[in-house]
Every structure is written in structure tokens, then in C-alpha cells.
């Protein structure tokens, strides 16, 4: 019988993580839970350690090297110690019912074609499913921060794309998804070259190049209480800088952009950052 493990990454937000653990620790749909404390600066690790049991492992990362590195600690632990078949990557600010995980597991069990599976994500007043891998123009939109005002649907699939039970997409949200353990091991786990952001696009890019398929299961959903940990620990302009640094890494390494294309993106970033900084001064 296939086994499911879940990785929850905590950083300075033990209260949110504890709420999730209190909810999911009794779920029969999950065989093993690993909480990775990403070297929090509060007493998260000590407080979460109280939850350790036969089902729950609490691990402390030696250094906070970001989202991908922290999740890799948990994924490798699940695969090495418990030999799980499926790994769920989850933010601590996710609300998920046991039946959602059971339904996702059943789909993975009966369809070898599915390498990554995501539920529908309810995020504030929005619904997130999946998106297309970013184009060069799409990266310009991200850098200039004009998506919300002028390009809301750019890079998104039309609503009709999600009429069936399963919808194939390039990328799914990193806040909650299930991946085959042998697949994430084969691709070398998450790329630790980014600290935060773009890990989903990187994984989607790697999987697509290998011919592996990613799907959204439209019959189930979870709720995401958006970026609790990130909003608590990183200021807005710093988040923007981290985002663009990850974007540049992705474009350079995975899309093999030439030096002129990269220079243009960097110029856009400098101009956009100056504009955002000045705007922030007058708030």
C-alpha cells in the first residue's frame, strides 16, 4: 500500500504550524509528518518539539538557506527514513481536509502519468489552480509589477481549461501539492539556488523538459491563508528584491538567456526598484 508523507516548513511562526499539526495529526490519509524548522529566531523548534511522536518528526535546519533548501531537508528525511511513495509539500498556513489527501492519493495510484498533483487553492477571495511557464515578456511584467493593473490573466489558463476532472498545467502553486517521491529524487530535489520564490517555475520547467506531467485535480480544494510566515519576516521591498533575484536565476539557468537579454531585465529591475522606493517614501 502506497505511503504519503507531508513536509511542513516553519520559520518564526510556530503558532500557525501548531494549528495545522493539531488538525492533521490524526489524519489516516497521512502516514508521516515532518516539520522542518528553518532555523527560526524565536523558540519555534523547542515548542514544536512537543509534538514529536511516532508519526511526527520535528527537525531543525542548521541554517536558513531558503524555501527550497528547507523543504529538501524534509523530503530527503521522508524518503530515506520512511520510504514514502508520495510527498506533500505544504505551507503551515494551509487548511486541508483528510478526504482531499485521500482523493489525491487515489488519483496518483491509478494514473502513473501524474507526476505532480495539486488541488484547487482558495486564497483570500481568489481561486488559484495552475499557470503557464513564464515567457520573457511575462518576466518583464513581473519586474515592472504591472500584473495586477494591466495583465491580470497573462500566463493563466482560461476557465474552460478546468472543466474536466483533471487539468494539465505547466506549474502549480508551491503552497500545497503532491509529488511522486521517485520523481523529486530523480530531478535532484528542489533547486537550492533560490532563497524564496520561483521554486514552482523551476520545478515545472525541469519536469516539462523531461516530459513529466503536472495536473490540477478540480474536484478538491484547500484554503491558503496567504504568506503568513513571509509577511511576518520580510518587508515588501526586500520581498521584491528576492523575487527578482530568483527570476534572474531562473532565466539565466533554465531559459539560457543571453547576456543582452539579462542586461535588459536588470535595467528594468533597477528602474522599477527606484520607482517603488520613491513611491514608498511618500506613503
Please report, for each region that a protein language model flagged, where it lies by residue.
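N-proximal low-complexity "stem/linker" segments adjacent to membrane-targeting elements
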Residues: 1-23
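Donor nucleotide-sugar recognition loop
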Residues: 169-176, 181, 185-216, 220-222
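Active-site-adjacent helix/loop segment of glycosyltransferases
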Residues: 205-283
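Glycine-rich, basic loop-to-helix element that forms the pyrophosphate-binding segment
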Residues: 61-81
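Acidic/His-rich active-site region of diverse nucleotide-sugar glycosyltransferases
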Residues: 60, 94-97, 103-187, 201
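Short beta-strand-to-loop acidic/aromatic patch adjacent to the donor-nucleotide binding site
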Residues: 83-95
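Short, acidic, metal-binding catalytic loop of nucleotide-sugar glycosyltransferases
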Residues: 22-31
